[in-house]
Design a protein with these regions (language model features):
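Internal hydrophobic alpha-helix adjacent to the cofactor/substrate pocket in enzyme cavities
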Residues: 189-212
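Flexible, glycine/charged-enriched surface loops at secondary-structure junctions
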Residues: 74-81, 140-148, 207-212, 296
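An anion/pyrophosphate-binding glycine-rich loop and adjacent beta-alpha core
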Residues: 1-131, 223, 228-312, 317, ...
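Glycine-rich phosphate/pyrophosphate-binding beta-alpha loops
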Residues: 179-187, 243-245
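Extended, charge-enriched "interface" segments that sit outside catalytic cores
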Residues: 241, 258-427, 431-434
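Glycine-rich loop(s) and the adjacent beta-strand/alpha-helix scaffold that form part
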Residues: 1-14, 137-138, 142, 195-203, ...
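A glycine-rich dinucleotide-binding beta-alpha-beta segment and adjacent secondary-structure elements
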Residues: 105, 117-181, 211-224, 349-403, ...
Length: 435
């Protein structure tokens, strides 16, 4: 059957901004430099609202400690594991008893509401304890709250019982996505929902499934981690979980996913054409830089003015771009032909210039990571599901045999990522497969 277990989540108190003396807090302004994953349409920047910082103190800690016996996290009511990276305020006090203060961040919930999210003050304690503790903070002495912090416990389903399409291995045609798979976070849930929704639709019309590899998207990394390794705590996606981070850049999300989306019918023709125009423009810039000759006598005075080492011999423009202090923008100011090459198409100059420069400046790193990914793809092509009776495969380690039997991986690459399955176990399987 479908295996279930429990995890927990905890939320912070919501404060009414009316009556909060922001002059007693440190302002944290919003971003001023904005990037986007989609370059289509008008680049609209929403009004940035500041956040505010304050700190707990010894009196706050004493008040909270007096209520520990009433905290479900510490009186046995909630025993399951919560998110590692956003512990409750009571957990901070217990884990770090030597700390006299902890930072709190007052964050607006929106432009048209007085409700503010007190990040850092998640709690499962009774409301009166939370309120008394807040009032010991000078900036929140007169604070009123909309809702106290709270903790919940919830069921999740073992994600190792899912295929990479997020279809259940147990019940055909049933797809799982989001918190029920043991993840925490909006983007994590949204990414799974996208993949599960696509595959549910494909399943209904009898088409083959849609899956993403670890070198294609962070969604691919997340789903592979869930289905291969499982979870014993709420799973949060971090860039550090991806071994192919250089291939999963902000500037190349369209390069990785637009054509796949168009083939699936979830991206319209104008988006596809938008990407093709960009791809061709990037190619033209790279070709121009790879073939454009630079004469040292002409360029050296200009390089010295930019604070970089002069050339000892002539080179191609692409070689200059590899230098740390040089980029297409400052080089275009001293090389008129380059400036002209960057102007087409004029309405997309910034995004295309950035993408072309990254591909040239980091070419060696990108190609090296691509080769590593391609080697792993060869293992992805070796299907092993149903080809071994793991309980009788005594040539591999006991732990590896048990893990393989429980997870039943689809491919040899997936098997290699299962904790407890060693490289020697993979080699044994390769030999048995005649590879």
């Amino acid at each position: 059957g479908v295996n279930t277990a429990k995890l927990s989540a905890i939320a912070p108190v919501r404060v009414d901004k009316n009556g909060v003396p922001f002059t007693a807090m440190e302002e944290q302004p919003g971003d001023s430099d904005f990037h986007q994953f989609s370059y289509m349409g008008e680049h609209r920047v929403l009004k940035q609202l500041p956040c505010w910082t304050c700190y707990t103190n010894k009196k706050v800690h004493e008040t909270l400690k007096s209520g520990l016996a009433d905290s479900p996290l510490y009186n046995g009511q909630i025993q399951s594991t919560g998110p590692r990276y956003c512990p409750s305020i009571e957990t901070k006090l217990v884990t770090f008893p030597d700390k006299d203060q902890h930072p709190l961040f007052l964050e607006p919930e929106g432009e048209d509401t007085n409700e503010m999210y007190l990040n850092g003050f998640s709690s499962s304690m009774p409301m009166d304890i939370q309120l008394n503790a807040l009032h010991e903070i000078p900036a929140l002495r007169d604070a009123k709250i909309y809702r106290p912090g709270y903790a919940i416990e919830y069921d999740y389903f073992d994600p190792t019982q899912l295929k990479h399409s997020l279809e259940s291995k147990i019940i055909k045609g049933l797809f799982f996505a989001g918190q029920v798979n043991g993840t925490t976070g909006y983007e994590e849930a949204g990414g799974q929902g996208t993949v599960a929704g696509i595959n549910a639709a494909l399943h209904c019309v009898g088409d083959k499934t849609f899956e993403m590899n670890r070198d294609e998207s962070y969604i691919g990394v997340l789903i592979d981690d869930l289905t291969t390794k499982g979870v014993d705590e709420p799973y949060r996606m971090f860039t550090s979980r991806a071994e192919y981070r250089i291939l999963l850049r902000q500037d190349d999300a369209d390069a990785r996913l637009t054509e796949k989306a168009y083939e699936l019918g979830i991206a319209k023709r104008d988006r596809y054409d938008w990407w093709i125009e960009k791809k061709e423009a990037i190619g033209r810039i790279i070709e121009f830089c790879a073939n454009y000759p630079i004469k040292k006598d002409e360029i050296n005075p200009k390089l010295e003015a930019l604070g970089t080492t002069p050339l000892r011999a002539g080179c191609k423009l692409i070689d200059l771009i590899a230098r740390p202090h040089l980029n297409l923008t400052n080089l275009s100011e001293i090389i008129p032909d380059l400036k002209a090459a960057l102007e087409t198409p004029a309405n997309r100059k910034e995004e295309i210039t950035e993408a072309a420069e990254i591909k040239m400046k980091y070419k060696g790193y990108i190609e090296r990571e691509r080769l590593i990914a391609e080697k792993m793809h060869r293992l992805e092509d070796i299907k092993i599901k149903g080809r071994f009776n793991y309980s009788e495969l005594h040539e591999i380690s006991t732990e590896g045999r048990q893990k393989l039997e429980r997870i039943d991986p689809e491919t040899l690459a997936q098997a290699s990522r299962i904790p407890g399955v060693s490289p020697s176990d993979i080699n044994v399987m390769l030999v048995l497969l005649g590879r």
